[in-house]
UniProtKB/Swiss-Prot annotation:
Gene from which this protein is expressed: ribH
Keyword Transmembrane among record annotations: no
Coiled-coil boundaries: none
Gene source species: Pseudomonas aeruginosa (strain UCBPP-PA14)
Protein name, entry field: 6,7-dimethyl-8-ribityllumazine synthase
UniProt keyword tRNA-binding, yes or no: no
Length: 158
C-alpha cells in the first residue's frame, strides 16, 4: 500500500504577500521584517509582490490583518511583531488576543496567516529570535506562508 502525501513546498507560486507589522518594539521588529522579506525574495517572490502594512502594535495586528484579508488581493499574510513580558499582566492580554485574533482571521477568510509575533520574557530573547542565536522568526514565518500557499493550492486543485 502506498500512502499519498500532500505537502507544501517553498517554491513561490505566483502570488502577493502582505506583511502586517506592529511598530512597537521596532528595534526587534525591523529585523523580523528584513528576515521575512529576504526569505520571500530568496524563494522567488518579487519585491513588487510584497506589501508592508504597519500597525501601532501587536494588539492592533489582528484588526489590520482582518481588513487586509477582507479586501482580498493577497495570497498570504505574515504577521510580525514583538510582545516582551513586563511586570504587569498586560503581556498575557496582548499576546493572547493577538494570537487568537490572527487564528480567527485565517479561519474566517481561508487565507494563510503566518504567525511571526514574538512573545518573549526578555529583550535578550527577542534579540535572539530576530536574527541571532535562535534564527530569525520573521524568515520562518515567511517560509510558513510560502508553504501554506503551496499546500492550499494543491488541496484546491484536487
Amino acid at each position: 500500500m502506498t500512502l499519498k502525501t500532500i505537502e507544501g513546498t517553498f517554491i513561490a507560486p505566483k502570488g502577493r504577500y502582505a506583511l502586517v507589522v506592529g511598530r512597537f518594539n521596532s528595534f526587534v521588529v525591523e529585523s523580523l521584517v528584513s528576515g521575512a522579506v529576504d526569505a520571500l525574495v530568496r524563494h522567488g517572490v518579487a519585491e513588487s509582490e510584497i506589501t508592508i502594512i504597519r500597525a501601532p502594535g501587536a494588539f492592533e495586528i489582528p484588526l489590520v490583518t482582518q481588513k487586509v484579508a477582507q479586501q482580498g488581493g493577497f495570497d498570504a499574510i505574515i504577521a510580525l511583531g514583538a510582545v516582551i513580558r513586563g511586570g504587569t499582566p498586560h503581556f498575557e492580554y496582548v499576546a493572547g488576543e493577538c494570537t487568537k485574533g490572527l487564528a480567527q482571521v485565517s479561519l474566517q477568510f481561508g487565507i494563510p496567516v503566518a504567525f511571526g509575533v514574538l512573545t518573549v520574557d526578555s529583550i535578550e530573547q527577542a534579540i535572539e529570535r530576530s536574527g541571532t542565536k535562535a534564527g530569525n522568526k520573521g524568515a520562518e514565518a515567511a517560509l510558513s506562508a510560502l508553504e501554506m500557499v503551496s499546500l492550499l493550492a494543491q488541496l484546491e486543485a484536487k
